[in-house]
Amino acid sequence: MTPILLSAFWTYTLITAMTPGPNNILALSSATSHGFRQSTRVLAGMSLGFLIVMLLCAGISFSLAVIDPAAVHLLSWAGAAYIVWLAWKIATSPTKEDGLQAKPISFWASFALQFVNVKIILYGVTALSTFVLPQTQALSWVVGVSVLLAMIGTFGNVCWALAGHLFQRLFRQYGRQLNIVLALLLVYCAVRIFY
């Protein structure tokens, strides 16, 4: 990979990993509501699911030409529906002001999110088909870059969770407003899938 292509790869992957999306918003919300330690299950579920999805993207990227457009469209609708459901859960979740201690979303729920998270699917397919496959079609490289993509995505999730933890006091003071803003950002993510 040339230095120019490598810099484009890093720019694309880091910007995509650090911008708002379902995982980052969920990580921020969970750490704000429950603290970083209690959010580690959420982050672990995301990370494992992310890795598996990136490996699946590697396989998909190899056979991109034969993907049924109807299946991709169906996946987009399923992803949008799940993201809207997640937005509803965040918008209606109790805050500390409400005097309730809701538990964070489970490992398995955050794991399952990855399989309908269109942002990471597109992230994986785009990175692999744009930066890797034109350079090499060696399976070891494709798998290696898939693992790297999952690590970069996990880094973004942890950064957002740490921000939620570090600004917890401020976010708790304005918990209801924050939850509504985060929910609206998720709805925006769902809408952006189609437009």
From Swiss-Prot:
Transmembrane segments: 10-32, 47-67, 70-90, 105-125, 142-162, 177-194
BP-aspect Gene Ontology terms: cysteine export across plasma membrane
Molecular-function GO term, any one: amino acid transmembrane transporter activity
Stored InterPro entries: LeuE-type
Record flagged with keyword Transcription: no
Cysteine pairs bridged by disulfides in the record: none
Cytoplasmic topology ranges: 33-46, 91-104, 163-176
Periplasmic topological domain residue ranges: 1-9, 68-69, 126-141, 195
Name the record gives this protein: Cysteine/O-acetylserine efflux protein
